[in-house]
Amino acid sequence: MPAKGADLSAHRETADVVVVGGGVIGLSVAWRAAQQGQQVVLADPQPGLGATHAAAGMLTPIAEAAYAEREIFGLGQDSLRRYPDFVAELQAATGLPTGFRQAGTLQVAYDSDDLAVLTETRVLQESFGVHLQQLTARECRAAEPMLDPSVRAGLLAPADGSVDPRLLAAALLRAAEQAGAHLVRQSVTEIRSAAGRADGVRLADDSVVHARWIVLAAGWQSAAIAGLPTGIAPPVRPVKGQIIRLRTTATTDADGVPPGLLQRTVRGIVRGSSVYLVPRDSGELVVGATQEELGADMTVTAGGVWELLRDARTLVPGITELEIADIVAGLRPGTPDNAPVIGPCELPGLVFATGHFRAGVLLAPVTADTVAAYLRTGTPDPGWRPFAATRFGVRGVSPPGSPGPEVAERAAAGMQVEEAATAWR
């Protein structure tokens, strides 16, 4: 390998691992793999500027609990437990902030119909073994005084948290490079194979990097890269999300309390529509997010922004005084059952770490730890079973007991029930 930080694009190089994609998943995998002594090449023309850049950074497996997603809930809980140590290690290694907060999530309902949906949400969460604190309208406003008086009731998930994905990505990139990973600011145009095994990638400038392992973490574009044999490509698609960042011009008060309207993440149902507001210590408030099946469209629309601001203002009228700092659209990598695709496939040397949909930031620690362990040992973790590519009929490699395609079909059917019953999107 060349010296740390060298430009690999002009060379034909060899590495232990090539990570394709520099979002929060790819960055985390690259960091963990480099930490265990492997020579890592991370390929992405703009690391951290895909779905990660547009993410709110909610760490809310409990509040996100949904029908047909029990396995994702368990994986999310596992990853949330890892987060404090994950960010502490990251910040110690780099000296960079991540915006990590663990102040909880308050789920609220605006009217009687929304309250019925919130009740259904509570029943679902209890079926997962989670019992949240039920709050009256008065208790909701005591917890968050800036809530509108019309809020009817709430559920408090005290262990939930949030992180700033943009800060997290910057810290992960520095940590990965400090651990020895080499960043190539180019896209991967082809997965190369030889003798029945993935053995490298071709970059946009036509140079080649050979590697023992290729980790496909390219988000919604994972299935579009050339060179994937028939039946191997993971079934990911782009799902558009628009998100708004607001900020206050106020400064920290005399007691050192940061500015802001909210103390914790608030997720609301407003006349059947869902909205979330995620506060940052800086005083920034993130409002999101739409969910639109429009292919690779990344247009910010007046309608999408209006709906988000309308619902957010209904819950927290004070947002009208905030400055608009940023409005962006991103593309989440969705799968037919909303769950990620993690693990090896029938093409030896190729490992999936994609399709994390709404939960990429949340699932980064557990995905990175699990994939890095596989890169070290070559043995699939049984915990991957619900997320094996074989559940879609893709020619993956399944740990014993992995689900088949019929599981994904049942899950996809369950999504329709979830959308009608919970509306927490």
State where each predicted segment sits:
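Extreme N-terminal leader/targeting segments of oxidoreductases
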Residues: 1-16, 35, 405-408, 414-422
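Short beta-strand to alpha-helix junction loop
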Residues: 74-77, 108-117, 156-174, 299-303
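Helical element adjacent to the flavin cofactor pocket in flavoenzyme catalytic cores
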Residues: 155-205, 209-213
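Dinucleotide-binding Rossmann-like beta1-alpha1 core, especially the glycine-rich loop
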Residues: 58-139, 143, 311
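Short hydrophobic core segments
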Residues: 18-20, 209-221, 368
